[in-house]
């Protein structure tokens, strides 16, 4: 609902809706799910002489935010609401109101919520573990496809897992509320979802209220379905768009129905396939609504806010407009609504009580763990201890950190009462496309003058391989620098404080030599294979120190240049120390935080190396945002401190942040140093991915001898660029220039700090 579905998602949606329609046409289906218990809907004001009044709030995505002003009008007129049933967005608004939230609170929540962030499951980079942060350097992204041991190929059921959406529902309804019957809420409530296996409506009348809301809003192909009591549930709008039958089954004698569904379009022969698919899905949802509305009697009322095409299903950023339209509809319906007034006029101004349940003291913690992670590992993310009060805010933050494992479809908790005691039940479910997750990536550098590097990457992540979260990854790279590598990462404790990593494989790199005018005159190809191993001490998700060793063998040959230069074989063996301080929000468009890397590499003959030398590497970056503006500062210092580094160990420079007036990897040397300052302006942000324009000033150089390094020998570089953090990687178009040379145009994909 947060975004306009893609063509593939529309096809999935229409297929699901069609399947549902084949089995859900009969009206009594929803009523059959909930017993016609007229005691659910009782006169809350004690006035048994009047009829019981129920609300049926229809689905419609962002259009459903107009429900709030309808509710506010009922309060103003003093119309009692005895029970509520809601579908999709109607379940969102209805559940908040039924749980005791005032209309002012609900309105404030929908106006202040960052809906783009809510519908973006990605955990902010600064909150991820160091392991997940390090994956940014692999330039790989999960594509929603994987391999399962029981079913072969697995495909993610939706684009979004709805983690932040569920957290919003928990905050909105009171996370500390003990699960139970929805009849026990301040206003009895029902949420309507759809059984994915039958297409029939499922009326949820007990359990976790936030999970009921989440199930009712599980739009097919957009959100992952929800598992509840043996059923897999989708959005309720698929089967019961306006739950009039449900609120009637609760015992309502007079019904106020609110229809916020999207009307059918008027198409002609030029209609696109996307428009046709929209129309097909519209047939099903509007048909469901029409069948429900036909059951209304002369004492009932339907209100249709005139949303037209001004507020679409995914237009959550238009909350203020939806509220305004809802107010107009409520005002227009006022004469008809007056027939629902039974209380004295003075009662109309009495505010509704807003019971806020206190965070309960926890007596027990249960976990239903469907993953291969250890129970204790998952619980270590959640600050819940028997004998202490539940901290709902900390629980929500811990759940979001647990999603940082990258392999969970859901991790939820429910406050339950057992044997007179209150406790927490945690349920963890793995992604359906695991435990072998397919990944893909693309890196590109092109100066539009014939110098380009392109690498296509495909990987498989196997996770978890141990209760503590061991992982393995195999990566195949094709293109300018082909390779086949593998890694095994093994934590030794729950907190991932101590871990080991073993990497190995084959890699090929090119080293280019350019003349003074920037034309390539030579290119060397370096092929190497070998293995490295490290032990890490992780102090937090920000700081890590590692020690290790590496052993490689390979060869260097000329691809462009003097054919008389013979191929040379080499042997590499070194011990290494690395330290990382990583608290930056992005490696590609940094706006806040710091990043520092330090490394020592000692090549030794007793490790099998041809040459003995030592290298010191240090990089530091910082970024700070001011609204849409951000500034960046950085410096790098890399030297061969002793000995002579061979060709395979020299440094490469060129490109944005690395002397942008040079082509990618144009500069080579055994030593280099640079400083830079940058500025970016965020043009837009969509589902956590931003489009930015900016520029850099850079000063530095590369040298063959350390004695030649001199501040006055640096070269001033500058660049301006525009970029977008796309789903295939950060794509950047820019112009780089340096003193004493012509400007170059560059295109980069997947290049970062």
Please report, for each region that a protein language model flagged, where it lies by residue.
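Patatin-like phospholipase
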Residues: 2, 11, 29-85, 95-400, ...
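C-terminal segment of classical bacterial N-terminal signal peptides
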Residues: 20-29
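Gly/Ala-rich beta-loop-alpha elbow adjacent to hydrolase catalytic centers
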Residues: 86, 90
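Solvent-exposed coil/turn segments that connect beta secondary-structure elements
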Residues: 102, 111, 194-197, 207-209, ...
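A generic beta-sheet turn/junction motif
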Residues: 197, 371, 417-419, 624-628, ...
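Acidic/histidine-enriched alpha-helical segments
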Residues: 265-267, 338-355, 551-552, 593-596, ...
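Gram-negative/organellar outer-membrane beta-barrel architecture
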Residues: 393, 398, 410-576, 651-657, ...
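C-terminal outer-membrane beta-barrel translocator/porin domains of Gram-negative envelope proteins
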Residues: 410, 423-425, 435-447, 474, ...
């Amino acid at each position: 609902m947060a975004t306009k579905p893609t063509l593939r998602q529309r096809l999935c949606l229409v297929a699901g809706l069609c399947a549902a329609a084949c089995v859900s046409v009969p009206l009594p289906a929803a009523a059959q799910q909930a017993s016609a218990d007229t005691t659910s809907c009782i006169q809350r004001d004690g006035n048994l002489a009047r009829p019981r009044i129920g609300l049926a709030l229809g689905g419609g995505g962002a259009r459903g935010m107009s429900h709030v002003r309808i509710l506010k009008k009922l309060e103003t007129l003093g119309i009692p609401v005895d029970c509520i049933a809601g579908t999709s967005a109607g379940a969102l608004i209805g559940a908040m109101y039924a749980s005791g939230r005032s209309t002012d609170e609900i309105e404030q929540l929908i106006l202040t919520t960052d809906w783009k962030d809510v519908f973006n499951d990605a955990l902010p980079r600064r909150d991820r573990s160091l392991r997940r942060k390090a994956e940014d350097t692999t330039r790989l992204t999960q594509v929603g496809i994987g391999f399962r041991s029981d079913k072969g190929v697995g495909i993610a059921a939706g684009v979004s897992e709805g983690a932040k959406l569920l957290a919003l529902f928990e905050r909105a309804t009171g996370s500390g509320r003990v699960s139970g019957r929805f009849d026990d809420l301040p206003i009895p409530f029902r949420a309507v979802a759809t059984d994915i296996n039958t297409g029939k409506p499922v009326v949820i009348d007990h359990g976790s209220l936030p999970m009921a809301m989440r199930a009712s809003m599980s739009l097919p192909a957009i959100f992952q379905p929800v598992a509840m009591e043996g059923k897999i549930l989708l959005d309720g709008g698929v089967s019961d768009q306006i739950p009039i039958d449900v609120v009637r089954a609760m015992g309502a004698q007079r019904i106020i129905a609110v229809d916020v569904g999207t009307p059918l379009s008027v198409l002609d022969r030029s209609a696109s396939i996307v428009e046709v698919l929209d129309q097909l899905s519209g047939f099903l949802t509007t048909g469901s609504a029409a069948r429900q509305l036909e059951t209304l009697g002369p004492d009932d009322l339907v209100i249709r806010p005139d949303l037209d095409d001004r507020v679409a299903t995914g237009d959550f950023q238009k909350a203020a407009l939806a509220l305004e339209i809802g107010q107009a509809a409520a005002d227009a319906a006022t004469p008809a609504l007056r027939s629902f007034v039974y209380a004295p006029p003075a009662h109309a101004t009495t505010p509704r009580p807003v019971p806020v349940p206190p965070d309960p003291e926890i007596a027990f913690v249960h976990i239903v763990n469907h993953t291969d992670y250890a129970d204790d590992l998952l619980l270590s993310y959640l600050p819940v201890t028997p004998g202490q009060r539940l901290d709902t805010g900390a629980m929500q933050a811990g759940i979001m950190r647990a999603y940082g494992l990258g392999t969970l479809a859901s991790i939820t908790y429910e406050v339950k009462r057992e044997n007179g005691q209150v406790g927490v039940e945690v349920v963890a479910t793995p992604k359906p496309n695991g435990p072998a997750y397919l990944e893909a990536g693309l890196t590109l550098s092109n100066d539009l003058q014939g110098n380009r590097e392109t690498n296509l990457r495909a990987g498989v992540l196997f996770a978890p391989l141990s209760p503590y979260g061991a992982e393995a990854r195999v990566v195949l790279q094709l293109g300018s620098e082909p390779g086949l590598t593998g890694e095994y990462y093994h934590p030794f404790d729950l907190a991932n404080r101590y871990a080991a990593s073993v990497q190995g494989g084959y890699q090929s790199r090119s080293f280019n030599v350019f003349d003074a005018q920037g034309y390539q005159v030579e290119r060397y190809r370096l092929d190497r294979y070998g293995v490295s191993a490290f032990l890490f001490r992780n102090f937090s998700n920000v700081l890590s120190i590692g020690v290790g060793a590496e052993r490689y063998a390979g060869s260097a040959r000329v691809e462009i240049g003097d054919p008389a230069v013979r191929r040379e074989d080499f042997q590499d063996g070194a011990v290494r120390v690395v330290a990382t301080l990583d608290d930056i929000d992005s490696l590609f468009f940094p706006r806040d935080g710091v990043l520092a890397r330090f490394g020592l590499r000692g090549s030794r003959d007793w490790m099998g190396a041809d040459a003995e030398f030592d290298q010191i590497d240090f990089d530091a970056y910082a970024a700070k945002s001011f609204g849409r503006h951000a500034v960046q500062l950085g410096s790098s210092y890399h030297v061969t401190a002793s000995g002579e580094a061979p060709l395979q160990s020299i440094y490469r420079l060129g490109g944005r942040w690395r002397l942008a007036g040079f082509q990618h990897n144009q500069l080579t040397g055994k030593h280099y140093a640079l400083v830079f300052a940058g500025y970016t302006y965020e043009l837009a942000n969509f589902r956590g991915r931003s489009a930015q324009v900016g520029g850099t000033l850079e000063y530095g150089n590369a040298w063959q001898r350390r004695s030649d390094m001199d501040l006055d020998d640096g070269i001033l570089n500058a660049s301006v660029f525009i970029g977008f953090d796309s789903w295939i990687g950060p794509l950047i178009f820019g112009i780089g220039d340096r003193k004493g040379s012509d400007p170059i145009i560059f295109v980069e994909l997947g290049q970062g700090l």
